[in-house]
Each structure stands twice: as C-alpha cells, then as structure tokens.
Amino acid sequence: PLLLTLVVVTIVCLDLGYTMTCCNQQSSQPKTTTNCAESSCYKKTWSDHRGTRIERGCGCPQVKSGIKLECCHTNECNN
C-alpha cells in the first residue's frame, strides 16, 4: 500500500508541472513551437526600417510604447 501511495503522489506531482506550448517563430518564418513553464504566450508587433516585425514567445512581457502586445492563455494561441 505504501508503494502505491508513493506512485500516485509522484504522478500527481508531475502533472502539476504542466507546460504550455507557445509559438516562437519570428515575423513570417515557418511556424515553430516551444514548451513553456509560463501559463501564457505573447506576440509582439512593431514596425521599423525593415517593415513590420513580429516576435513570439512564452510569458507576457512588458513592452515599450509603440509595440503592440497580445498575450493569450491557450496552446499555440500566439500564432
């Protein structure tokens, strides 16, 4: 019984470390994803001398003015 209890506790603990899948490709590159410890994904959009730039990743960072930030909370929501 003790061993079974330890196995159940281990499984429950491992499930608590759920990771989210966020897109992490830049601008118009082919879609790529990464597993994140954060519970959100972001998409930053801004314009510079090269045109419209897009950065994607994990979390929800603070941005400077002039940068559009979208944060979301489902897998691959920042594509």
Curated annotation (Swiss-Prot):
Tissue: Expressed by the venom gland.
UniProt GO cellular component terms: extracellular region
TM spans (from-to): none
Keyword terms of this UniProt record: Acetylcholine receptor inhibiting toxin, Disulfide bond, Ion channel impairing toxin, Neurotoxin, Postsynaptic neurotoxin, Secreted, Signal, Toxin
InterPro entries: Snake_3FTx, Snake_toxin-like_sf, Snake_toxin_con_site, Toxin_cobra-type
SS bonds (residue pairs): 22-41, 36-58, 60-71, 72-77
Signal peptide: 1-19
SUPFAM superfamilies linked: Snake toxin-like
Keyword Secreted: yes
Subcellular location: Secreted
Keyword Signal found: yes
Molecular function GO labels: acetylcholine receptor inhibitor activity; ion channel regulator activity; toxin activity
Entry's family note: Belongs to the three-finger toxin family. Short-chain subfamily. Type I alpha-neurotoxin sub-subfamily.
Function, as annotated: Binds to muscle nicotinic acetylcholine receptor (nAChR) and inhibit acetylcholine from binding to the receptor, thereby impairing neuromuscular transmission.
Protein name: Short neurotoxin 2
